[in-house]
């Protein structure tokens, strides 16, 4: 766990990498988008950006002394113990805490991730003795897996299952325990170290590609800002305090606005037409694109999705779902844009 006293580089001070920042923000507005896979060169600020986002987010109300960060009113985000207390009409004390940001280490075992059941205690004392894992700690927060392409496929499957369902189930020797595990899954990796299997890649809601900044003036700006932050973190954070507060409020407003956003039928049909023409397997691409477009409209403070909203997110939602053709020279992102322009040209 990170030390909360250590200053964290502010999200609004991060230069460039707009694609990654947008994908992360939209997943915070609507966690049901299904997470982000960030592929790119080493040293491009992936970890810095994710930590900065977690630090930016408003504090959340959680039930005190609860290992699952249970929500005080939402049953979907509440552990069985807390639900039992509520049903019995008992008083529940609350505390406020930062949105959890959990790092999943590469060598983590399944027990460390999912939690363990003390079988001996369960059999002798008749109680379900459960030791929560990282998924419990990540409930209502962000779970970050660096170099996810080097993680065991079975573990990636478990993470994706929990992220999609919002629950983690642990079964040992006929004893079963279930707890809420609703989190934004963020994976990052370097394409040189190997790709994820297509069926795993497809289950990430969005896929952002980032490159090392080439523009010399931007590079100088990034280096100078980092030096300034390292020299005097307090002054640097003060400088960005207002911008951080404005963005934090935008996120809160977008989360509240999300359910009111409309996506008209014609645009939905066009989105599905793009997916169909690109030969995207299944319907996950259609669903995620619809969700992301609504999240973007809410983030921009609108209650209706525009064609421009779809243009900004469709590549992020579809590029990783295209079948790889080794003979094709066009990049998958450009392919998505090309088909989008043709199908949406008459709207």
Curated annotation (Swiss-Prot):
The pathway where this protein functions is:
Porphyrin-containing compound metabolism; chlorophyll biosynthesis
| CC annotations in GO | cyanelle
The answer, when asked if Plastid is one of the entry's keywords, is: yes
Looking up InterPro entries in the UniProt record yields:
AAA+_ATPase, CHLI-like, ChlI/MoxR_AAA_lid, Mg_chelatase_ATPase-isu, Mg_chelatse_chII-like_cat_dom, P-loop_NTPase
Q: Which SUPFAM superfamilies match?
A: P-loop containing nucleoside triphosphate hydrolases (SSF52540)
Localization recorded for this chain is: Plastid, Cyanelle
Per the annotation, which location comes first and is thus the protein's main one?
A: plastid
Q: Which GO terms describe its biological process?
A: chlorophyll biosynthetic process; photosynthesis
Reaction equation(s) it catalyzes: protoporphyrin IX + Mg(2+) + ATP + H2O = Mg-protoporphyrin IX + ADP + phosphate + 3 H(+)
Gene Ontology MF term list: ATP binding; ATP hydrolysis activity; magnesium chelatase activity
Which keywords does UniProt give here? ATP-binding, Chlorophyll biosynthesis, Cyanelle, Ligase, Nucleotide-binding, Photosynthesis, Plastid
The task this protein performs is described as: Involved in chlorophyll biosynthesis; introduces a magnesium ion into protoporphyrin IX to yield Mg-protoporphyrin IX.
The name under which this protein is listed is Magnesium-chelatase subunit ChlI
Q: Which organism is it from?
A: Cyanophora paradoxa
The UniProt gene name for this protein comes to: chlI
């Amino acid at each position: 766990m990170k030390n909360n006293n250590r200053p964290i580089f502010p999200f609004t001070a991060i230069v460039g990498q707009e694609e990654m920042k947008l994908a992360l923000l939209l997943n915070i507005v609507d966690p049901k988008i299904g997470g982000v896979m960030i592929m790119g060169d080493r040293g491009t600020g992936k970890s810095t950006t994710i930590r900065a986002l977690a630090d930016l987010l408003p504090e959340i109300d959680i039930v005190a002394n609860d290992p699952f960060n249970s929500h005080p009113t939402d049953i979907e985000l509440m552990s069985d113990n807390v639900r039992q207390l509520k049903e019995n009409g008992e008083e529940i004390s609350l505390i406020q805490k930062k949105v959890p940001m959990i790092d999943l280490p590469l060598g983590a075992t399944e027990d460390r991730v999912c939690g363990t059941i003390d079988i001996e205690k369960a059999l002798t004392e008749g109680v379900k003795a459960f030791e929560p894992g990282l998924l419990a700690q990540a409930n209502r927060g962000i779970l970050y897996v660096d170099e996810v392409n080097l993680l065991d496929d079975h573990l990636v499957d478990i993470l994706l299952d929990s992220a999609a369902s919002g629950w983690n189930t642990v079964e040992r020797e006929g004893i079963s325990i279930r707890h809420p595990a609703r989190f934004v899954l963020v994976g990052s990796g370097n394409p040189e170290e190997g790709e994820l299997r297509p069926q795993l890649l497809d289950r990430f809601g969005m896929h952002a590609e980032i490159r090392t900044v080439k523009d010399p003036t931007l590079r100088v700006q990034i280096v100078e800002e980092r030096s300034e932050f390292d020299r005097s973190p307090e002054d640097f954070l003060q400088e960005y305090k207002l911008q951080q507060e404005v963005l934090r409020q935008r996120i809160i407003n977008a989360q509240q606005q999300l359910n009111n956003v409309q996506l008209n039928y014609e645009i939905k049909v066009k989105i599905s037409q793009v997916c169909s023409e690109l030969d995207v397997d299944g319907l996950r691409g259609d669903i995620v694109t619809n969700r992301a477009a609504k999240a973007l409209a809410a983030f921009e403070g609108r209650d209706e999705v525009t064609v421009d909203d779809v243009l900004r997110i469709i590549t992020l939602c579809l590029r990783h779902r295209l079948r790889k053709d080794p003979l094709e020279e066009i990049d998958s992102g450009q392919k998505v844009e090309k088909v989008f322009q043709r199908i949406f040209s008459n709207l």
